[in-house]
C-alpha cells in the first residue's frame, strides 16, 4: 500500500471504534427516520418471536447479527421481546417498519423481503452505535422505509471471465446488505458461453472453453450446470435477490458461432476467426435454424431460472459488417420491403421475442439508438411496447427516457457515465488497460447520479430503477469484481433506494466509513477512496 492508502485504512479503524452517531452507518439511508427517547437493554435470555414460517430465514439472519454484535444468538420461539412479523396492511412489497423502544424490538413487513431488510437496517444501527452496542443497548428509534425504485440491480459478466458459483454467492451476500434486489448474469458473449443447454451440448463443450492450455475451471474456461444455477437461484431468493439471465443476441455471439458455425451469415460460413476475442460476427436473421436453436435456449433458460424475466441483449450488433454483406439477409430485407438491413432487427426480434412470450418470459433489451449515424434521435428498430429497455450508452439516457415515455416502454437506468463499474475509479487506477479510452467514473460521480433527471413524476413514472454494470474484460476474479464494485456500489444503492430530497454527499461520505470497515472485516475487497479525505468537512 502507498502512504495515503495506509493512512486511510488506519482512519477507517479509528472511526469504526469511535463512531457514536446512532444513524452513522445507515446505507442506503432510510426514507423516514424518527429518533426517540430511551434505550432497549438486552439480556442474554432474549428470544426472537417469529409470527410466520416465511420469516425463518430473516430470523436466522437476525441470530447471526446478535452473535456478531453482542456475542450471543437468541433462540427463535413463538414470542419474545424481539419480534418479526408480517403485516398485510403495509403497502409495499419491500416496505418495512423497524421500532425500538424500552420494551423491545419489532420488525414488520408485508412480505418476508421487507422483514429481511429491516434486519439489515437493525444491523447497521448496531454497527454505527458502537458505544451502546458494546454495552448491550439499542437506542430507541422508529424507521418506516420503502425503496424509491422497485428495481435495484448489479450485473456480473462471467462470459468474459468465468466466476465460480461460490464466488457469485459471495457477491450476492454483499449486495443484499445494501438492498440491491436483482443480479443480472451476462451468460454469453464472444468470449464464452456459460450455461448448460442440454439440447445443444456444443454450446458448452466448445463455447465454454476458449483456452485449451488452461484448466477446465479458470477465468477463461468453465460453465454453470443447470443444477448449479437452480441452487444459486434459491440461494439468492432467500436474500431477496432475483437473478435475471442474459443471453446476448444477435451480436456478441462468437462463442455460439464457434460451437455451431452453420448459424453464421452465409458469406462467413467458411471464414475463420479467433474464438475468445471480440469479433463483430452475428447470427443470421435469414436462417430458420437460428430461431430453432434460440427457441430451445430460451425454453431451457426459462426452466432453470425462477425469474419470469430474460435479457436478450440486442446491443452493438455490427449489422453493416454482417447482414449488409449477406446475400440471404439482403434478400430477406427486400422481401419485407425494407430499405436498410438495420430493419431486419424487427424480423429477428419479432421471432425471438415470440419465443420468450411462448414460455411466459418478459423480455429485456439494451436500448439502442440509431447512433451509428449521429445524431442519435430515434430507436435503432421498433421495440415492442411490452419489452423493458435498459439505457446504457454514455450521455444518451435523457433521450432514452424521452423515447421510452413516448413509446410506452418500461426503462431501467444504467447510464455509462454513472454506473459502468468496469470504468476506472481514479486516474491511473485499475483496469490496467484502457484501450477504449474509458472515462473515469469516480465515487462522487456515481453518488451524483440522479435517477429522476429532475423530471416531474409524471414524466418519469415509467422508470423502474437503476443498474450498475460490471463488464468482465478486465475482471478476472471475484476480488477484482468487488474492487471495481465497491465503494461505488454503495453510492448506487442510495440512488436506487433513497429519495433524492434525503440524499447528501457529505452525509454519505460520513456513513461510508463504518461500512468500508465492515466490508474489510467480511473479507470483501474494495478500492480505498483516499481522495475524498482531502475534501473539506
Positions of the model-derived regions?
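Bacterial Sec-dependent N-terminal signal peptides
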Residues: 1-25
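Contiguous, structured surface segment used for ligand recognition
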Residues: 20-149, 480, 496-507, 511-524, ...
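Short glycine/serine/threonine/alanine-rich loop segments
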Residues: 72, 180, 239-241, 361, ...
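Feature activates predominantly on carbohydrate-active enzymes
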Residues: 91-311, 355, 467-472
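Active-site-proximal loop/turn and secondary-structure-junction residues that shape catalytic pockets
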Residues: 187-191, 247-253, 316-318, 367-371, ...
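Active-site neighborhood of glycoside hydrolase catalytic domains
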Residues: 256-261, 272-388, 392-408
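Flexible, acidic glycine-rich loops studded with aromatic residues
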Residues: 363-370, 377-537
Amino acid at each position: 500500500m502507498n502512504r495515503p492508502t495506509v493512512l486511510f485504512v488506519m482512519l477507517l479503524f479509528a472511526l469504526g471504534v469511535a463512531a457514536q452517531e446512532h444513524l452513522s452507518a445507515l446505507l442506503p439511508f432510510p426514507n423516514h427516520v424518527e429518533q426517540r427517547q430511551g434505550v432497549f437493554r438486552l439480556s442474554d435470555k432474549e428470544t426472537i418471536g417469529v409470527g410466520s414460517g416465511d420469516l425463518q430465514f430473516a430470523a436466522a439472519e437476525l441470530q447471526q447479527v446478535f452473535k456478531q454484535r453482542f456475542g450471543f444468538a437468541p433462540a427463535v420461539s413463538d414470542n419474545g421481546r424481539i419480534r418479526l412479523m408480517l403485516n398485510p396492511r403495509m403497502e409495499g412489497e419491500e416496505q418495512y417498519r423497524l421500532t425500538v423502544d424500552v420494551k423491545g424490538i419489532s420488525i414488520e413487513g408485508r412480505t418476508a423481503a421487507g422483514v429481511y431488510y429491516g434486519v439489515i437496517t437493525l444491523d447497521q444501527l448496531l454497527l454505527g452505535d458502537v458505544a451502546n452496542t458494546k454495552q448491550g443497548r439499542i437506542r430507541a428509534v422508529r424507521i418506516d422505509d420503502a425503496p424509491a425504485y422497485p428495481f435495484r440491480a448489479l450485473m456480473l459478466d462471467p462470459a468474459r471471465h468465468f466466476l465460480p458459483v461460490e464466488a457469485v454467492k459471495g457477491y450476492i451476500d454483499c449486495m443484499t446488505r445494501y438492498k440491491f434486489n436483482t443480479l443480472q448474469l451476462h451468460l454469453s458473449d464472444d468470449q464464452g458461453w456459460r450455461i448448460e443447454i442440454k439440447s445443444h451440448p456444443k454450446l458448452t463443450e466448445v463455447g465454454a472453453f476458449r483456452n485449451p492450455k488452461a484448466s477446465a475451471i479458470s477465468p477463461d474456461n468453465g460453465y454453470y450446470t443447470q443444477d448449479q444455477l437452480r441452487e444459486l437461484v434459491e440461494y439468492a431468493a432467500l436474500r431477496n435477490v432475483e437473478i435475471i439471465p442474459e443471453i446476448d443476441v444477435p451480436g456478441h455471439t462468437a462463442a455460439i458461432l464457434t460451437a455451431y458455425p452453420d448459424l453464421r451469415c452465409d458469406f462467413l460460413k467458411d471464414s475463420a476467426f479467433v474464438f475468445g476475442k471480440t469479433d463483430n460476427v452475428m447470427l443470421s436473421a435469414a436462417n430458420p435454424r437460428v430461431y430453432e436453436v434460440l427457441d430451445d435456449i430460451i425454453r431451457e433458460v426459462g426452466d432453470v431460472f425462477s425469474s419470469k424475466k430474460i435479457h436478450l441483449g440486442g446491443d452493438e450488433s455490427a449489422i453493416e459488417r454482417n447482414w449488409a454483406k449477406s446475400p440471404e439477409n439482403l434478400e430477406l430485407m427486400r422481401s419485407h420491403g425494407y430499405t436498410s438491413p438495420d430493419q431486419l432487427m424487427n424480423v429477428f426480434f419479432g421471432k425471438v421475442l415470440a419465443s420468450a412470450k411462448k414460455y411466459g418470459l418478459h423480455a429485456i433489451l439494451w436500448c439502442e439508438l440509431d447512433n451509428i449515424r449521429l445524431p442519435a434521435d430515434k430507436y435503432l428498430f421498433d421495440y415492442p411496447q411490452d419489452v423493458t429497455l435498459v439505457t446504457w450508452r454514455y450521455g444518451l439516457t435523457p433521450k432514452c427516457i424521452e423515447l421510452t415515455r413516448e413509446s410506452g416502454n418500461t426503462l431501467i437506468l444504467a447510464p455509462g457515465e454513472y454506473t459502468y463499474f468496469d470504468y476506472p475509479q481514479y486516474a491511473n487506477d485499475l483496469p490496467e488497460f484502457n484501450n477504449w479510452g474509458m472515462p473515469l467514473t469516480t465515487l462522487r460521480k456515481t453518488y451524483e447520479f440522479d435517477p429522476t433527471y429532475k423530471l416531474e413524476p409524471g414524466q418519469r413514472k415509467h422508470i423502474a430503477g437503476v443498474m450498475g454494470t460490471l463488464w468482465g474484460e478486465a475482471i478476472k476474479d471475484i476480488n477484482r469484481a468487488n474492487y471495481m464494485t465497491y465503494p461505488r456500489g454503495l453510492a448506487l444503492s442510495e440512488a436506487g433506494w433513497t429519495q433524492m430530497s434525503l440524499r447528501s454527499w457529505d452525509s454519505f461520505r460520513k456513513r461510508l466509513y463504518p461500512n468500508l470497515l465492515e466490508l474489510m472485516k467480511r473479507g470483501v475487497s474494495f478500492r480505498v477512496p483516499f481522495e475524498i479525505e482531502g475534501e473539506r468537512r
